[in-house]
Amino acid sequence: MNKGEDNLVRTSITVPEQLLQKVNELIASGYFASRSEIFRQALREYLQRIEWTERVGDEEYFGALTYVFQHERAEPELVKVQHEFTDVIISTTHIHVSPEKCLEVLLLQGPGKRIAELAKRIRGVRGVEQAKLTVVSSEGE
């Protein structure tokens, strides 16, 4: 158990049945001891990524923002957001996953604060189902 987690609080969450089935399979395979542990770890990792976006400064980073979205619902707003961030978007790759869904990968370079702002805006677009930002420092740290 991590420091600060000695006072656990019981809560409940609602998840799609297929997601819970995958969680149960991971537990059965021995990757995690329990549902609680897998959800705690997932929350920790997600919160660490979000906290980075809140504290990052003007240091230069390289990165990739990958996201899946519902084409008809999200595309107009995504194009608008991308045009507001041409200063950090180096390249865009667009893939048609199905008739309804697309995947895009944005290659990024620029101030971390600006990259974080772009990721936040993309995640906030209705119809974006998943988004993941991966960054590396231009200093190699």
From Swiss-Prot:
InterPro entries: Acetolactate_synth/TF_NikR_C, ACT-like_dom_sf, Arc_rbn_hlx_hlx, CopG, CopG/NikR_regulator, Ni_resp_reg_NikR, Ribbon_hlx_hlx, TF_NikR_Ni-bd_C. GO terms for biological process: response to nickel cation. Its cofactor is Ni(2+). Binds 1 nickel ion per subunit. GO terms for molecular function: DNA binding; DNA-binding transcription factor activity; nickel cation binding. It comes from the Archaea. Signal peptide: none annotated. Keywords: DNA-binding, Metal-binding, Nickel, Transcription, Transcription regulation. CDD domains: RHH_NikR_HicB-like. Ni(2+) binds at residues 83, 94, 96, 102. Transcriptional regulator. Belongs to the transcriptional regulatory CopG/NikR family. HAMAP family: NikR. This is Putative nickel-responsive regulator. It comes from Methanopyrus kandleri (strain AV19 / DSM 6324 / JCM 9639 / NBRC 100938).
